[in-house]
Amino acid sequence: MKNPLLIDNLLSQKDYDNLLKEIKNPKDFDYDAGFSRYLNDHRGLPVLKELSDKLTQTARNIFNSQTLLSTYTLFAHYEGQDPEPSLFKHKDTNACTYTLDMCVYQNEPWDLWVEDKNYTLYPNQALAYYGEDQFHWREKFPSPETNKVAMIFFHFAEPDHWYFTKGSSYIDVIWGKMTEEEWKLKNE
């Protein structure tokens, strides 16, 4: 796969219904003011780990890699006006070699752009793309006074990725929060 791929019915109906039941109130999740979103991962929402495990073989088939492994999965609920939700143009840096971005629910679609092409996702649809290699972003959030959009970001990488060889804390070196030497001392 080279170009992004739109996938219908990423989850079985049973898994999708169970996911909706498990989410409950996303406003109880951690709030990320920078993107105006509420976040949770597998530690706070265990169903995410279950779904990621189930989708690993699907991701292997889509990305033509029988060795990729799940790195982390993140649930994000976007809403509000102060500030409006946003996602700037970027390439991922945190163990997101392969990405499946799934729409969970929405009042109004909020297109995902990958390499200058927009993709409209509907509930239980996903977009497969290379998060670390392809620029992706979202344009202006539609109808911020009423819209709510929830996404799950399923991320995968190869076993030789730093996430597996050095551990998830190595992101501090990637993001320039500490030097390699400082990280080594801290993790001895």
Language model: regions and residue ranges:
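Histidine-/acidic-rich catalytic cores in large beta-rich domains
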Residues: 61, 66, 149-153
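Short, cationic low-complexity segments
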Residues: 171-188
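Catalytic core of non-heme Fe(II) oxygenases with the double-stranded beta-helix
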Residues: 80-139, 145-152, 157-173
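Secondary-structure boundary/capping signal
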Residues: 59, 66-68, 108
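A short coil-to-beta-strand element that immediately follows conserved catalytic motifs
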Residues: 64-74
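Non-heme Fe(II)/2-oxoglutarate
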Residues: 1-63
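Conserved active-site beta-strand element of glycosyltransferases/polysaccharide synthases
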Residues: 77
